Structure formats: structure tokens, C-alpha cells
Amino acid sequence: MSVDLSAQQVTRMKKLQKKIRSEVGKAISDYNMVEEGDRIMCCLSGGKDSYAMLDILLDLQQRAPIKFEIVAVNLDQKQPGFPEHVLPAYLDSLGVAYHILEKDTYSIVRDKIPEGQKTCSLCSRLRRGTLYGFAQKIGATKIALGHHRDDIIETLFLNMFFAGKQKAMPPKLLSDDGANMVIRPLAYAREKDIAEYAELKGFPIIPCNLCGSQENLKRASVKEMLNQWDVEHPGRIESIFTAMQNTSPSQGVDREQFDFISLTRDANAPLKGEVAESDLPAFDFVDVSNNGHIDLDAASKAKRVNPEHKINIVSTYTP
């Protein structure tokens, strides 16, 4: 879609494109998302995220030192009022290979889910199954989804708050049957940057409320919490994502991730690290059978002056 932009807006658009492209490139490199000869099935929903993902991947395709194919795929789930002409017209204008799949999952969901209940879970499973199957049919080696960093962090808190799990969306995922590899190239990109970029680019956004499903109130509440943090505590969101990349199982409580049961100490281990740097040599002169109050600062200083110095007991504990 053509958008008339001021010189300032053009500059801003180019700056955002460079930023997002850099983040996508780093994510691809960090997780080995794209390899020589890959055929990437880029899943388009008609939303800002998938449009931006396709746009950036096409740009990187021209710059990358490796060769890979991009095939855009949209699943038309026959939701009432879905503008079927929008995506084909846009993709034709780009000259990119694409497929529009038609499958009436909308009717299946309406038949299975009682009126008033959320349809998202079943709808998502049906959509995923169709896309996974089609990826194998066309020989796609990777399936690219448009989830960004905010989605990943929101999912972590949703699972922590409502499912009791430390689980998010991995940037790269092997399907349960091992047949499909899912990648999320926008894993390092912020939603606010993507939204601004999509507006400046004039992507033909298709509204996401066509199914008439209820808003996911849990996700909305988590998003609101994170947005508030982002305003009140700049840098906190970045810190959370960095923490997700720097986990330490031995410092946690998950027995499945670390073998706490088999932990044993080595009584003959040499002193090193924090222990070696402390004043513990003063303990060499302590009579541990004596319940006393010991001035370690004075003891350490005295020991350095006179190695034979004995520690004076400041006070004695009497039960």
C-alpha cells in the first residue's frame, strides 16, 4: 500500500527498518534459524507482525551471504467478513511466491465450542496442524512465525501466573513429531517498533477480531502490567528478556533441570574463589570446642603480623 510520508517519516522508517533488520539478523545468527538452501514458509495472518516479518526477511534475502527461498502462506479459515482479496493483491505487488489455503476451521470451531466460550485454543490447534502438514507438502525446511519479544515475555508471565510453569516461546522449535522446524525471526524485536514500522510502511492490515472471539483477558492483563513497567522502569523489559537467556539451573529449584539429589561435597577441596579471598585463615587458630565471640578482623590482622598469634576470645556463650 502506498503511503505519502514526509521526509522526517521516511528517515524514521529507514531507521526502524535498520533496527529491526539488525535484531532479526542477530536472532537468526544466534539460533541458526536460516541455513543455506532453506525453503522458508512465511506464515501470514494479515497482522502487523507477520507483514513486518515477511518484509524484513525479503530484505535480508537480498543481503545474506547464503541462498534461501521464501514462500508466503496464508490460511483462510473462512471467518465471516474476511477480506479475501487483500493478501493476494499485496503479495502479487511484491512478486513473492505464495499460497492461500482455504479451510473452514471457523465452522468446526463453532460446532465444537459452546457459545460464549473462548475458541482460541481449538482454532490455534487446527491452524497449526494445517500449516505443519502443508509445510511438508511443499518441502519447507523452516516455518516462520511472527511472534516478537513482547509475545515471548508475555507468554512467560502467563505460564508463571496461571499455569505454574517457567515456559515461554522459544525462538526456534522442533515440532513434537520432529518433522517441522519453527522459527521466530522477530524474537529480538519490540512490538512498539514493529507497530510503528507497519504504520509507516502502510501494510494492508486485516483486523484480528473477525472471529468475534472474546478478548484474552489474562494476556491483556499481563500486557498491561508489562507496558506499565516499561513506562515506569525503562530497561526492565530488556532486563527480563536478558534474564531468560541467562538461566542457571543449579541456582533454581527445578529438580528436573538439575540433579540436587546427587550433590556431594568434597572435604578435601582446596580453598578458592570467595573462600580463598576471605579472612578464613584466621580460623586456623580457633578452638571450635569453645563457644566464643571472635573478632575476625583483629585476628586476621594479627595473623599477618605474627603467624603464631592466638585469637583472643572476646566473650563466651554460656547456655
Swiss-Prot record:
Gene3D superfamilies in UniProt: HUPs
For the keyword Thylakoid, the answer is: no
The entry's cellular-component GO terms read: cytoplasm
Q: What is its EC number?
A: 2.8.1.-
Which residues of the sequence carry a binding annotation for [4Fe-4S] cluster? Answer: C120, C123, C211
Indicate the enzyme's highest-level EC class: transferase
Cysteine pairs forming cystine bridges in this chain are none
Pfam family name, one: ATP_bind_3
Q: Which cofactor does it need?
A: Mg(2+); [4Fe-4S] cluster
Keyword Nucleotide-binding (UniProt): yes
Q: What is its main location?
A: cytoplasm
Q: Which UniProt keywords apply?
A: 4Fe-4S, ATP-binding, Cytoplasm, Iron, Iron-sulfur, Magnesium, Metal-binding, Nucleotide-binding, RNA-binding, Transferase, tRNA processing, tRNA-binding
Hey, which pathway is this one from? tRNA modification
**For this protein, what is any one GO molecular function term?**
tRNA binding
One of the protein's GO biological processes: tRNA thio-modification
State its location(s): Cytoplasm
Motif PP-loop motif: list the residue ranges. Answer: 45-50
Q: Provide the reaction this enzyme catalyses.
A: cytidine(32) in tRNA + S-sulfanyl-L-cysteinyl-[cysteine desulfurase] + AH2 + ATP = 2-thiocytidine(32) in tRNA + L-cysteinyl-[cysteine desulfurase] + A + AMP + diphosphate + H(+)
UniProt-listed InterPro entries: Rossmann-like_a/b/a_fold, TilS/TtcA_N, tRNA_Cyd_32_2_STrfase
> Cofactor note, please?
Binds 1 [4Fe-4S] cluster per subunit. The cluster is chelated by three Cys residues, the fourth Fe has a free coordination site that may bind a sulfur atom transferred from the persulfide of IscS.
Entry's PANTHER family? AMINOTRAN_5 DOMAIN-CONTAINING PROTEIN (PTHR43686:SF1), SULFURTRANSFERASE-RELATED (PTHR43686)
> Miscellaneous notes for this chain?
The thiolation reaction likely consists of two steps: a first activation step by ATP to form an adenylated intermediate of the target base of tRNA, and a second nucleophilic substitution step of the sulfur (S) atom supplied by the hydrosulfide attached to the Fe-S cluster.
Q: How is the quaternary structure described?
A: Homodimer.
Entry's family note: Belongs to the TtcA family.
* Job of this protein: Catalyzes the ATP-dependent 2-thiolation of cytidine in position 32 of tRNA, to form 2-thiocytidine (s(2)C32). The sulfur atoms are provided by the cysteine/cysteine desulfurase (IscS) system.
Report the protein name in the record. tRNA-cytidine(32) 2-sulfurtransferase
